[in-house]
Amino acid sequence: MDAVTVNNFFLIGAVLVGMSILVSSLSSRLGIPILVIFLAVGMIAGNDGVGGIVFDNYPMAYLVGNLALAVILLDGGLRTRVSSFRVALWPALSLATLGVLVTTGLTGIAAAWLFDLHWMEGLLIGAIVGSTDAAAVFSLLGGKGLNERVTATLEIESGSNDPMAVFLTVTLIEMLASGQTGLSWGFALHLVQQFGLGALLGLGGGWLLLQLINRMHLAGGLYPLLVISGGLLVFALANAVGGSGILAIYLCGLLLGNRPIRSRHGILHMLDGMAWLAQIGMFLVLGLLVTPHDLWPIALPALALALWMILVARPLSVLIGLIPFRAFHDREKAFIAWVGLRGAVPIILAVFPLMAGLPNAQLFFNVAFFIVLVSLLVQGTSLPWAARLLRVVVPPDPAPISRAGLEIHPTSEWELFVYHLNKEKWCIGAALRELKMPGGTRIAALFRGTELLHPSGSTILEADDILCVIGHEHDLPALGKLFSQAPDRGLGARFFGDFVLEGDAQLSAVASLYGLKLDGIDGEQALGRFIAHEIGGEAVIGDQVEWNGLTWTVAALEGNRIRKVGVKFPEGRPGPGLFL
């Protein structure tokens, strides 16, 4: 490779990445998932597009795809709160195993019939597109304000279902290549090995990496690089010994993100940029890899298969996978079924048959690519609409306009929160001493216009003041009630109900106040405890229960305890305006 070729490579790469970033603003304007934009840029620059770039290096695409996916999963694990496992671990694992099997089987049967393939080749297509994609899920669910049970289930599922899809794909390729037509006990053993070794190496490697980071004294910019290199080492080791590298690096990130770690905010800041670069690079390469004119001959059967998977296979897999978990409402199940987003993973898995030289391998790749495109365009584009229709959106928590980490000591979790006080805030005109600040928080600075003031207890807050507060992440809900942009009160009233009651209120008192019948229910118990029992599992904000013709909504939690409950009356039946 001469100097001119290298320079052209840099030139083309920079132009494509830059174009992807610049046109990404179209995503929100057009309501199209940003991943589709990146994929489209690659296709436009490819063989059939205006760029005319010929790229058919499948091993290179496999390398780029795996590297990018590893970085995205590491970043996703770092940002996943382990508290979300409280409500979603077992349901997500059920969907990641049983759900993938059901989706693979149903999609495989349809694929074999639509494309006139052997049943094992049909199952191979089903396995390739059987898992939801972490990159797509993390990208499209971020900032949508979905309730915790739905968000956590989808994110954990997408981070843990790839091992099953990879295992099924590799096993079916080996069987097709060797002419084998039956399954053996080694099938189940290999699956246990994938999950077991992946989990062991992910958690073990994450713990060792955590100890190393907290004991090393390095330049600040080197800690994120150490996390990335350590995560990739865990990913590669797990793959080398027969485990799931994808699961391993996700769990490695999960452990690092939920423990005190040196330079936390620097690590998260850099990983955010690296994850974006990984998504752009991966979808650009996959867009370059496909030849659009090859998709037209299979468009109709591939569209039928995509719709079968979206409307039949995925909903049935969710319905079966969530049978043991009664805490899920039908509307939550429906939303989870709809958000079975496919992304880069199926396209990467579709490269496996090409590298193995299987007959019909190009067909498998084209079908997988078409299904991913339909999934992102149909499911991804309609996600906000589906969330509102199925009522899984909860009013957003108020948030500071910016936040930054304070590295006071190696594993410091102190942060600086910045709040803008507009004229609608109730605290305007109040003295600082009148504010009920959460314990352990301090107002560090106050800006008025361009002037820095020294805040004291007698300082009167004015409109457009900027407050800088030092605290911890768990202080954000309380601080939000004081300073942050006020949430839409109309939205809150529509969602949580006409009145909000204390969860500790005695059920008999609530029944007496609203004229409700207990019908043998223990009236001495707290309202929150009764609602939790009716939900049937771990409660999340936004959970709803119908009782005595009224809608009761979980409005606030304190740990696992329901702290506040909203009550909504039928139209035309107002209730007493009393807060218990």
From Swiss-Prot:
The gene is nhaP2. The chain crosses the membrane at residues 3-23, 34-54, 58-78, 95-115, 122-142, 163-183, 189-209, 218-238, 241-261, 270-290, 303-323, 335-355, 363-383. GO terms for cellular component: plasma membrane. It catalyses: K(+)(in) + H(+)(out) = K(+)(out) + H(+)(in). PANTHER family: K(+)_H(+) ANTIPORTER NHAP2, NA(+)/H(+) ANTIPORTER 1. Disulfide bonds: none annotated. This is K(+)/H(+) antiporter NhaP2. GO terms for molecular function: flavin adenine dinucleotide binding; potassium:proton antiporter activity. Keywords: Antiport, Cell inner membrane, Cell membrane, Ion transport, Membrane, Potassium, Potassium transport, Transmembrane, Transmembrane helix, Transport. Belongs to the monovalent cation:proton antiporter 1 (CPA1) transporter (TC 2.A.36) family. NhaP2 subfamily. Coiled coil: none annotated. The keyword Hydrolase does not apply. It comes from Pseudomonas aeruginosa (strain ATCC 15692 / DSM 22644 / CIP 104116 / JCM 14847 / LMG 12228 / 1C / PRS 101 / PAO1).
